[in-house]
C-alpha cells in the first residue's frame, strides 16, 4: 500500500542501472534463454519473458512485470548505431499488446531522434594556455564520447564551454582539470570531466624573475 511510481521514474532508474551495470548487466538481460544456477543441484532452464529480444532489432533488456493494479508492464532498452533508447509501458491489458505498443514506442524514438557526437573519446577538445611567459599549452581531452540527443526535426543551437579549475598546476597526464558543459538553446544539458593529456609544472618565483630579466635585457 502507498507504494507508487510512474513511467518516468522507471526510465530514470533504468538509465542509472545501465550506467552502473554496463555490459555486464546487458550481457545477462539480453539472454533469451539459459541455464540458471548450473553449479548447484537446483539448476533449471529459464526463458526470458521479454519477447522483444527476438521481436525487435537492437533490444538487449530489461525487465517485464505484472501486478493486478499495474497491469502488464515493461521496461525495455534498445541500441542501434550507438544510440540507446529506453522505453517504459505500464498498465497494458495483455503481454501481446504490451509488446506491440513497445515496438511502436521504440520505432518512434529511433525515427524521430538522433544522437550527435560532439567529441570522440580521447580526442583533443582544445589547447589551453597555462603559462603565458613560457607560452606553455596543454592538450585538453575527454575520456568518453561527448554526445547529446536531439529531435531530427529540431534546429537546435549547440555549443560547449570548458570551465577550468583555478590554479591547477602542477598537473599530471590524466588529471581532471575542469568540466565541459554541453549547452543546447542556452541550457546546459550535460557536464563532462576533462583531462590534461600533458604533464606541466608550475613555474617558481625565481624562474619567473629570471625569465622576466632575460626578456627585459
Segments from the language model and where they lie:
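Domain-terminus/edge residues, biased toward the C-terminal soluble/receptor-binding domains
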Residues: 2-4, 8-217
Amino acid at each position: 500500500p502507498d507504494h507508487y511510481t510512474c513511467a518516468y521514474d522507471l526510465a530514470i532508474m533504468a538509465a542509472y542501472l545501465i550506467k552502473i551495470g554496463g555490459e555486464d548487466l546487458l550481457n545477462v538481460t539480453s539472454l533469451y534463454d539459459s541455464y540458471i544456477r548450473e553449479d548447484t543441484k537446483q539448476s533449471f532452464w529459464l526463458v526470458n519473458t521479454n519477447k522483444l529480444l527476438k521481436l525487435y532489432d537492437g533490444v538487449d533488456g530489461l525487465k517485464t512485470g505484472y501486478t493486478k493494479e499495474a497491469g502488464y508492464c515493461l521496461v525495455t532498452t534498445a541500441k542501434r548505431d550507438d544510440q540507446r533508447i529506453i522505453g517504459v509501458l505500464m498498465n497494458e491489458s495483455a503481454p501481446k499488446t504490451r509488446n506491440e505498443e513497445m515496438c511502436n514506442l521504440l520505432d518512434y524514438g529511433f525515427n524521430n531522434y538522433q544522437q550527435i557526437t560532439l567529441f570522440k573519446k580521447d580526442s583533443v577538445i582544445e589547447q589551453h594556455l597555462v603559462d603565458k611567459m613560457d607560452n606553455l599549452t596543454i592538450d585538453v581531452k575527454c575520456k568518453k564520447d561527448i554526445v547529446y540527443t536531439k529531435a531530427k526535426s529540431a534546429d537546435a543551437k549547440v555549443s560547449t564551454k570548458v570551465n577550468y579549475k583555478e590554479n591547477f598546476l602542477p598537473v599530471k597526464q590524466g588529471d581532471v582539470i575542469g568540466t565541459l558543459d554541453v549547452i543546447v538553446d542556452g541550457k546546459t544539458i550535460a557536464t563532462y570531466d576533462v583531462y590534461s593529456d600533458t604533464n606541466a609544472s608550475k613555474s617558481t618565483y625565481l624562474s619567473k624573475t629570471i625569465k622576466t630579466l632575460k626578456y627585459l635585457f
